[in-house]
Amino acid sequence: MAKRVHLFDWHKEHAKKIEEFAGWEMPIWYSSIKEEHLAVRNAVGLFDVSHMGEIYFRGKDALKFLQYVTTNDISKPPAISGIYTLVLNERGAIKDETLIFNMGNNEYLMICDSDAFEKLYAWFTYLKKTIEQFTKLDLEIELKTYDIAMFAVQGPKARDLARDLFGIDINEMWWFQARWVELDGIKMLLSRSGYTGENGFEVYIEDANPYHPDESKRGEPEKALHVWERILEEGKKYGIKPAGLGARDTLRLEAGYTLYGNETKELQLLSTDIDEVTPLQANLEFAIYWDKDFIGKDALLKQKERGLGRKLVHFKMVDKGIPREGYKVYANGELIGEVTSGTLSPLLNVGIGIAFVKEEYAKPGIEIEVEIRGARKKAITVTPPFYDPKKYGLFRET
């Protein structure tokens, strides 16, 4: 049976399409993907992302453990703030892209992908129990995914909405900084973060879940529902729209963000013989702190020496056509790779995508062809984001 988020009943009543995603029954859209997408780019949208995973690490050795099992420098963010980091396997392949918050007092909160949190929790628990260097650590690992409702408020009007709801200016917070806030007596964690390319914030509310896999923990999500409805009510004057996973995907793609399961994954089987993806191939080396040891480091160093073989690149269609996952990519008549994500940009009304291609083609300004329904259509590789960052996104000037 598919998993369900705290507010599944609300979504079932209001969403036009609900579909299984990564093992969860989730709202795909309420009005339309395009309408919700443009609301986020031009005003503000509200997403229920409670399917994302949450894992707590507590104890005086929590930092030591996280430094070894993730790639970035987890000692860097002060309390309360976060850092983007990766979890790799021994071969250097990406198990997941994660966000880790230093909560203070030797406590850390990891946010991970919806279809990876169970795998990661099992992996971390296994390491702690079986690897000699970890067995005696002062460390508690707790899975909290089903106990936390997570909402994302995204768009240029998110700043105004945060001020109205919580009396704070999120623009005075750095990206991934967090703080405790209250709304009508309900305490929650708020972070300046998001997955759309726009300014925004995300809130984490611990509450009962009527669909919790542990029946003894089931209950009505009164706090989460109250916060969700208050955000929608307060956001009416800014044109807020509830937005589903359809718009979340087109927004992240316009911003050029990778998606676990498409661009980053263990054992990613593509027709171009790419079986696993490393941070070097996925343009994620910025999330690696080389001045420490971590699982997968040796494999990455060896890959650097021998070459990457394949690498991610972003592209925009020149000819009419919508690229989709699995479509083949050519250059000069040669098969060079395969599309990992593709869509028709709701903002630009042009086909855009991300592909794995031979390393020498993974740079902007290269003319390529994408095979769409049996015909090869012209495209060109570009530097993300796909939109004009002076007009849209976190650093817009207007």
From Swiss-Prot:
Enzyme class: transferase
TM spans (from-to): none
Gene Ontology molecular functions: aminomethyltransferase activity; transaminase activity
Gene Ontology terms: cellular component: glycine cleavage complex
Its EC number(s): 2.1.2.10
Reaction catalyzed: N(6)-[(R)-S(8)-aminomethyldihydrolipoyl]-L-lysyl-[protein] + (6S)-5,6,7,8-tetrahydrofolate = N(6)-[(R)-dihydrolipoyl]-L-lysyl-[protein] + (6R)-5,10-methylene-5,6,7,8-tetrahydrofolate + NH4(+)
Superkingdom of this protein's organism: Archaea
Gene Ontology biological-process entries: glycine decarboxylation via glycine cleavage system
Record-linked InterPro entries: GCS_T, GCS_T_bac, GCST_C, GCV_T_N, GcvT/YgfZ/DmdA, GcvT/YgfZ_C, TrmE/GcvT_dom1
Keywords: Aminotransferase, Transferase
HAMAP family: GcvT
Matching NCBIfam families: gcvT (TIGR00528), PRK00389.1 (NF001567)
Family: Belongs to the GcvT family.
Subunit architecture: The glycine cleavage system is composed of four proteins: P, T, L and H.
Function: The glycine cleavage system catalyzes the degradation of glycine.
Protein name, entry field: Probable aminomethyltransferase
Species of origin: Pyrococcus abyssi (strain GE5 / Orsay)
